[in-house]
Amino acid sequence: MIRQFFKVTLVVSMVASVLVGCNGSEPLGMGSEESISKIKELVKTNVDMNENKIYELQWEEDNGEHKLENMLSSITVGYIDKENNDYKLIIELKDGEFVAGEPDKNEKWKYSYEKSTALNLDDINAGLLKKMVKEGYDLFMTQEDSTQYDLKSVGKYRFYIYPVKVGREHLLAENESFKKEYTTMVSYFDLNFIKKDEAPEVRG
C-alpha cells in the first residue's frame, strides 16, 4: 500500500521540458528508467545498505538555470544506522557529475533501527512514477480553468516511511493504526504547470 500526495505549482514562464528523461551524455530526466537506475546506484554507493536503513528518498529537478526542464539535479537520502542515529545525505549534480556531501546527523532525535521499516528501493520504478504523474494530472484537469495550462515538469519525487522514534517502539505492537502508519510507504510529488498563452522565457 502506498499513500500518495502531490502539489501543483503554476508558473508564468515557459521553457522546453521532457518528462521521460534523456539518453547518452545528456542530463538525466526526472522519471526515466535510466534516471531511477542511476539514483539507486548513487544511493547504494554512498549508503551501506547492510549497516543502515533508508527511510526516505527524494530527488528534485534543477531550480536554477535549467528550471522546468525536468533535469535531475539533487538526491536526498534519509537513513538510520545501527546505533539509532539519523542522517541526511545530499547528492548534487556539479559540473556534470553527481557528488555526495557529508552526511548531516540529526542531533535532536534518535530513531529505532530495529523497529523502523526500510524503504524497498525495488518498489520505486518508472511505471510507478508514470502512474503517479498521470493520476496527479488527471486530478488537476478536473479543476476550473485547468485546460488553460500545460504540464511542464515534475519538480520533486519523495518516498518515505515514517521512522519509529526511540521510546515509541512499543506502540507498533499495541496500536494497529500506528503500525500501519509506520510501515506504509508514502509518496509525494510536485507537478509544475504553465499557462498556455504565456510567452516563452528568453535566455541570453
For the regions a protein language model found, what residue spans apply to each?
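A short, surface-exposed interaction/processing loop segment used at functional sites
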Residues: D95-L121, M185-G204
